[in-house]
């Protein structure tokens, strides 16, 4: 699908990023393209941009909440979404948090570009809990509507490989539902980056076997 058509589709399936209402790469590679290890990738959190969101995400990671959960929705050239204990886009963690984005009265300067991680939510701007999505390209039309809080800084090739899994038509009207579970086997905090930003390493189950 051409990019223009994709944008139209993305707008039409914004529900893919909504929880409970059922949720361009250049030729030059950056460091995010390099895998941090076998089937793992690293997300750097930016608490200066979204402190409430980062605190919530870090707590869930430390509690082991994400271990064994899957990416239940993968839309090529758009995003990959996971973090739902129900595995179908309708669940979340116990607590919801304030949506840190401009339409909810909070300044957020992190744009939804390739590798950026943001929170999924329902129509209620303060309904985000555990579900998150990773952008495959420039999805800046989502800016101001969702709380971007981190970025894949190592191993984006692993996230890219999600689209290699055969998918069926999802409830969002797109070919987005993986026929093979894409499972987060282990999610843990690792050393902060050189600027003191927290980092999370996600090791995936070998879903391409």
Describe each PLM feature range.
Residues 2-14, 18-209:
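Cyclophilin-like peptidyl-prolyl cis-trans isomerases
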